[in-house]
Swiss-Prot record:
Intrachain S-S bonds: C28-C65
Entry similarity comment: Belongs to the CCS1 family.
Top-rank taxon: Eukaryota
The protein's role, per its UniProt record: Copper chaperone for superoxide dismutase 1 (SOD1). Binds copper ions and delivers them specifically to SOD1.
Name of the molecule in the record: Superoxide dismutase 1 copper chaperone
GO biological process, one term: copper ion transport
Subcellular location per the Swiss-Prot or TrEMBL entry: Cytoplasm
Cofactor details (free text): Binds 2 copper ions per subunit.
Record-linked InterPro entries: HMA_dom, HMA_dom_sf, SOD-like_Cu/Zn_dom_sf, SOD_Cu/Zn_/chaperone
SUPFAM superfamilies in UniProt: Cu,Zn superoxide dismutase-like (SSF49329), HMA, heavy metal-associated domain (SSF55008)
Lineage, opening ranks: Eukaryota, Fungi, Dikarya, Ascomycota, Saccharomycotina
Residues binding Cu cation 1: C18, C21
Length: 239
């Protein structure tokens, strides 16, 4: 378990209709170390989690129990961000997606920010490294993102089979950096494989909602419900 300073609140949309549902959700999450408190709003189908646990761990645990979940906000206002990580190789978008990972980011103290990094669909197994580059210009892939601004020490072990294709690989890690959120917005988040063959994916770090800042059920832009948008996201490998 991490230090108390690493605890943060996150809200999730989870289908629920009664106390039997919330009891089942509690049972699903019971075995996860690091959860301090769970709160439920059945009328809004929202769950609040105070923990030091990666959001991907919460979501995957619920999916293993047959329940879907969408993270709706994390941390205090202006303390969260996200980066959708894409490959810059040629991809037939009619059959595939360029998305190969996701970084969910939340600041937990003045000089500590947590990064929940998921990689899914890389062609080579092994250790991948994460780093932040100085700018968010991904027009030419990683080579146009500028100098390395911060490099994480902990690798991401990508040795699990990807659910995109059995010949591809996936991995996850929960890492931290002594950087505030405001200093990350607009920069690029890069995952790369050292050695040969080399491989990298990247995305621009963008601000996301803090806890209880996003409780909409229908998107004003598309008219789709959050669950319809969730299906679209899953099709595009955003999990």
């Amino acid at each position: 378990m991490t230090a108390n300073a690493d605890f943060y609140e996150a809200t999730y949309a989870v289908p629920m209709h009664c106390t039997d549902c919330t009891d089942d959700i509690k049972k699903c999450l019971n075995g996860i170390t690091g959860i301090k408190d769970l709160q439920f709003d059945i009328s809004q189908q929202m769950m609040s989690v105070n923990s030091c646990v990666a959001p991907s761990v919460i979501i995957n645990a619920l999916r293993d129990c047959g329940r879907d979940a969408i993270i709706r906000g994390a941390g205090k206002p202006n303390s969260s961000a996200v980066a959708i990580l894409e490959t810059f190789e040629d991809v037939d978008l009619k059959k595939d997606t360029a998305v190969r990972g996701l970084a969910r980011i939340v600041q937990v103290s003045d000089q500590k920010t947590l990064f929940d990094v998921t990689v899914n669909g890389v062609p080579f197994s092994g250790k991948y490294q994460a780093k932040i580059h100085s700018n968010g210009n991904i027009s030419e892939g990683v080579k146009s993102t500028g100098d390395v601004y911060y490099k994480f020490e902990e690798p991401i072990e990508c040795s699990d089979a990807s659910d995109l294709d059995k010949s591809l690989y996936s991995g996850q890690n929960f890492v931290s950096a002594p950087l505030p959120i405001w200093d990350l917005i607009g920069r690029s988040f890069v995952i790369f494989r050292e050695g040969e063959p080399a491989y990298d994916i990247a995305g621009v770090i963008a601000r996301s909602a803090g806890v209880w800042e996003n409780d909409k059920q229908v998107c004003a832009c598309t008219g789709k419900t959050v669950w319809e948008e969730r299906k679209d996201a899953l099709k595009n490998n955003i999990k």
